From Swiss-Prot:
Subunit field text: Monomer. Interacts with ATG8 through an intermediate thioester bond between Cys-238 and the C-terminal Gly of ATG8. Interacts with the C-terminal region of the E1-like ATG7 enzyme. Also interacts with the ATG12-ATG5 conjugate.
Domain of life, source organism: Eukaryota
Principal localisation: cytoplasm
Record protein name field: Autophagy-related protein 3
Length: 346
């Protein structure tokens, strides 16, 4: 299924008529020329990003310049898995639940998850389980009776397995930004590596994707610019334009409000340069943007907060060449474990 989807996406990008008319402010979509301009801005301001070419001329998109087929950044750190670090208390506490008939303890079942809302955690009251699995009576353990682990000498003869590093420890990612002509917006591809430098198996990349996106808007597909097959995690661009338009509109509304406060003497001007832009982008609310975009019917504007429509071109908060900076802010909400800020150090 992923192969068919990847092939169809490649054909769509190649054979969909190319639009050179800018609708950036109205739709959130960009033209190939605007994509190149945004890529030039990104590589100039953030040198960790660079342009790259397809492996062969046959893999190139004809509407993009040779040598500027896609953007790439490497060695982006990812220190934690979302299934462990974004689960709250789930998985860290367990409770023995009695069976429906009120039988013995071994008739019950083990419930994992937080108990903080159901009962207080009594750390000094424990129940012993013997080798046969029988649960003993409750007993209160005195803290003085608990042995100190530091008092025990390590047995040097013990052979400790190194374990599987695939879902623990530091990973790194190579990130790619391509232009999706069928949707007239950027598309992100991600290729992961283990701490030892070995390629991360594609299915394990899903551990670094927010749960709501797994197998829905994030799929495993071949990277279209390589001659050989390389599976990567890719964020499908079907809703990118609507999400981007929302973020741009919110930024414009915030700029208008800030300028009105400045005129009234109630505020001060924002920072200038890249520091100011990154700071403003970090204030944008991305969490609900994608969900609302999905709910909006095709061809209709998503219903966000009321945005003033009298913002002139001279008052836009984010220019089209700064588009990819905002795009990376959105992608960071999909993969919060990957340190995208590492690629955008000011």
């Amino acid at each position: 299924m992923n192969f068919l989807r990847s092939t169809a996406a490649t054909l769509l990008d190649k054979y969909t008529p190319v639009s050179h008319t800018s609708t950036f402010r109205n739709t959130g979509q960009i033209t190939p020329e605007e994509f190149v301009a945004a890529g030039d801005y990104l590589t100039f301001k953030f040198p960790s990003w660079s342009w790259a070419d397809a492996d062969s001329p046959s893999k190139r998109l004809t509407f993009l310049p040779a040598g500027k087929q896609f953007l790439v950044t490497r060695h982006v750190p990812c220190h934690r898995r979302l299934n462990n670090d974004f689960a709250g208390d789930a998985g860290h506490e367990e409770a023995l639940v009695e069976g429906n008939k009120g039988g013995d303890d071994d008739d019950g079942w083990l419930r994992t998850g937080s108990m903080t809302s159901s009962q207080p955690l009594r750390v000094r009251e424990v129940r012993n389980i013997d080798d046969a699995g029988n649960v003993g009576d409750r007993e209160v353990v005195d803290e003085d009776d608990i042995p100190d682990m530091e008092d025990d000498d390590d047995d040097e003869a013990i052979i400790r397995a190194e374990g599987d590093n695939s879902n623990s420890g530091k990973r790194t990612y190579t990130l790619y930004i391509t232009y999706a002509n069928a949707y007239k917006c950027p598309r992100m591809y991600m290729s992961g590596y283990l701490a030892n430098g070995q390629p991360l198996p594609p299915h394990l990349m899903m551990e670094d994707i927010v749960g709501d996106y797994k197998d829905k808007t994030v799929t495993l597909e071949d990277f279209p610019f390589f001659s050989h097959s390389v599976k990567m995690a890719s964020v499908h661009p079907c809703r990118h334009a609507s999400v981007m338009k929302t973020l741009l509109d919110r930024a414009d509304a915030a700029l208008k409000l800030r300028r009105e406060k400045m005129k009234a003497g109630q505020g001060s001007g924002s920072e200038q340069g890249m520091e100011g832009l990154v700071d403003e982008i970090n204030k944008l609310d991305v969490s609900g943007a994608h969900a609302n975009a999905v709910e909006a019917a095709p061809g209709e504007d998503a219903e966000w907060e009321e945005v003033p429509h009298d913002v002139t071109d001279q008052e836009v908060a984010i220019r089209v060449d700064q588009y990819l900076v905002v795009f990376l802010k959105f992608i960071a909400s999909v993969t919060p474990g990957i340190e995208h800020d590492f690629t955008m150090g000011v």
